[in-house]
Structure formats: C-alpha cells, structure tokens
Amino acid sequence: MFPRCLRPTVLVRAIKLLVLVSSGIMFIKLVVLEKCTSSLGSLYYYDQNYTYRGSAVGTTETGPKSPEKVRVLVWIMTGPKNLQSKASVVRETWGRRANQLLFFSSVTNETFPTIGLNTTEGRQHLTAKTVQAFRYIYHHHLDDAEWFMKADDDTYVIMENLRHFLSQKNTSEPVYFGYRFKPFVKQGYNSGGAGYVLSREALRRFGKQGTDPKLCEQDGGDEDVHFGQCMQNLGVRITNSTDSDGHTLFHPFHPETHFFGTYPRRINFYAFRKARKGFEGISKHAISFHYVSPTLMRLLELYLYHIRPYAN
C-alpha cells in the first residue's frame, strides 16, 4: 500500500491505457508471452533449455509439482459499489482460472456472491478485511488448496504463471510471496495491490495466532504493512519472488508504469530491489499487475488467451 503521493494519477493511467490499446499486442507478446504461451485447454511453458507440457506427472506437496496440479485459492478484496463494475470482470476473466475464487466485502451478497465481514468500507479498514478474510479461509478452506492468494478487484493475475512459480515451492514452509517493499518491517512486506500468496503453513500459523493483537494488528493503518508485520511476528518468511534473471513477477503498478519506468518519485525508497523498466524489469513469466481497469482486464484476456502468432 502506497501513501497518496506514490499512487499514480488518474491522468497518467488514462494516458498509459491509450498507449496500451495502441501497442498492447506487441507489448504483451514480448513481455509475457515470449517463450511462455498458454491456452485455456492445455498449458505450455517454454524455456531455452526445456519444454514443459501440461500432462506431466506431479509429485508430493513438499517437492516440485506439475504446475496444473498446484491448487490455488484466490480471494478478492472488494466492496458493494465495485461488484458489477470491477469484481464481476475479475470473475469473468482471470479469476475463473483459480481453483477457488472468493469475494470478501463488508456486506454479504448471496446473489453475486460475496462473503460479508464484520467491518465497514474505507481504506482505514482494509487491515480488518484482510485479517478477517484469511481467518475465514483458515476455518473453512485450509485443506482446499496448497496456496492462498489475496488480490484486489483491480489486480490482474496470470494464473498459469503463478502456478508455474509455485510448483517449485514448498507449501509446508512458512513463506509468503509478492512484490517486496523494504521500509517499516524488518524483513520487508509484500504489496497488497500486486497480490501476495501464503503457503498453507503460513495460513495455519495465522489461523492459530493471528487473533493476538500483540502479534497482528486487527484494523487501521496500511493493510499490507500491518499484514507484513504480522507475518514476521508469526515466523513467516518473505522469500525471493523474482525469476532466475532477477526480473519482477509481481507488479504493484499498471503494466506501462513498469514497462516505461514512470514510477512514483520515491519508488526506490520503498522497493526492496531497485525498480527497473522495460524488458529488464518485467519477467516474461509475469504473474500480476495492479491498477488494471475492467477494460484493460478484457484486453489482457484477448492478448493472452485468444490471439496467437503463426508458428514459424
């Protein structure tokens, strides 16, 4: 979570969206799809040294696992005013590729549906939403997935790339992944907007001790900072969330902000690794982006899942 001085302006985002519409196919092909092509039916991951096919045999949860066998529960932080304008688009696009998709709001909506939490809307209550949502998931869904991701209703996630990343991780270890910021918490904390992922062991520790206000703030302040402090207090480690070339996988800003390097002025005060731009900054196996409008979500679906170049 950034203070207001670090949040992109509406004007900048609008300009960048126009750039994306005019050059999006080329951008997405180069940044995300180069050597990493997927379809809704059969997943393929390409690397210079090997080819992975979706029919590979998986192993135990404590070792490498076939990506399509990795179970990920995703929960979306939303609100009553955003259900039709934002949350519904998440559900129609990338959210349907999660193994389980839950929406949490301050109000229960049985039609959408959303799970109502004991809190009110507003930025000052995002911490309460987060801790209550994870507590609900601990009590009702701990055994339904190996990994548990929190995202916003303006986050876009490429689930195939997330599963591929997690397939080499151990969900029995107390870890959580995301875009790492460095101030305020000794080990740093992961950006809420970029989305962060807890292992089952991390969720288990939170479920058993997360109600203790001495360990975990229950409301107020910046949600991702407070939750990062909570994770540290529970012995949950932040570990590397970049690819083998050091390029970022989780992204707390709009795609063009990362690609063109138009970051907020104080980004390197916050970023654990120096923020870079272009192909040196964004992994070709990128997992998430933030500040993604409903229109852009649908465009990303088009570019990623429906347009294919002819093979040579």
Residue positions per predicted region:
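Secretory-pathway lumenal glyco-enzymes, predominantly type II signal-anchor Golgi glycosyltransferases
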Residues: 2-312
